[in-house]
Amino acid sequence: MMPFDIRVGQGYDVHALVPGRKLILGGVHIPHDRGLLGHSDADALLHAITDALFGAAGLGDIGRHFPDTDAQFAGADSRVLLREAARRVREAGYEIGNVDASVIAQQPKLAPHIPGMVANIADDLGLPATRCNVKAKTNEKLGFEGRQEGIVAQAAVLIWRGAIADAQD
């Protein structure tokens, strides 16, 4: 019998806000005069969660699996990347326990969009929404986030493998 193995992963991502791009966070299009600059759709929230999953499983990071130097990922939908990351984590023998994430942005206000983000993350990871949490924070007008030059996302995930008692959600 395999011993119980519980792990925590932490993810971080940041992208600059620029004109002429859509703002997508948690797979949700958010109306704004600027969007995030990046090789893919630049969804900082999903990138942070993806990085946390890979890190928890000891599988490296998002750049190792989906390099921004690879043309096949140009404009990629980060929800597709998140689903693939979850598949690889499960292929390594782990179950995903929960996700807790924060998005730091002065503007736009994200609270109205959080239920959609949570629904997308839960759907992509095959988890109940009760195990996915997204928080929106400002940086109190400090730093590049406060000056509305970019958006930061941070995420923590719990994964496990081995015998575990049935848990109730």
UniProtKB/Swiss-Prot annotation:
GO terms for biological process: isopentenyl diphosphate biosynthetic process, methylerythritol 4-phosphate pathway; terpenoid biosynthetic process. Disulfide bonds: none annotated. Its cofactor is a divalent metal cation. The keyword Lyase applies. GO terms for molecular function: 2-C-methyl-D-erythritol 2,4-cyclodiphosphate synthase activity; metal ion binding. Its EC number is 4.6.1.12. The keyword Iron does not apply. It is an enzyme of class 4 (lyase). Pathway: Isoprenoid biosynthesis; isopentenyl diphosphate biosynthesis via DXP pathway; isopentenyl diphosphate from 1-deoxy-D-xylulose 5-phosphate: step 4/6. It catalyses: 4-CDP-2-C-methyl-D-erythritol 2-phosphate = 2-C-methyl-D-erythritol 2,4-cyclic diphosphate + CMP. Binds 1 divalent metal cation per subunit. The record marks H39, T138 as: Transition state stabilizer. It comes from the Bacteria. 4-CDP-2-C-methyl-D-erythritol 2-phosphate binds at residues 13-15, 39-40, 61-63, 66-70, 144, 147. InterPro entries: MECDP_synthase, MECDP_synthase_CS, MECDP_synthase_sf. Keywords: Isoprene biosynthesis, Lyase, Metal-binding. A divalent metal cation binds at D13, H15, H47. Involved in the biosynthesis of isopentenyl diphosphate (IPP) and dimethylallyl diphosphate (DMAPP), two major building blocks of isoprenoid compounds. Catalyzes the conversion of 4-diphosphocytidyl-2-C-methyl-D-erythritol 2-phosphate (CDP-ME2P) to 2-C-methyl-D-erythritol 2,4-cyclodiphosphate (ME-CPP) with a corresponding release of cytidine 5-monophosphate (CMP). HAMAP family: IspF. PANTHER family: 2-C-METHYL-D-ERYTHRITOL 2,4-CYCLODIPHOSPHATE SYNTHASE, CHLOROPLASTIC (PTHR43181:SF1). Belongs to the IspF family. Homotrimer. This is 2-C-methyl-D-erythritol 2,4-cyclodiphosphate synthase. The lineage of its organism: Bacteria, Pseudomonadati, Pseudomonadota, Betaproteobacteria, Burkholderiales.
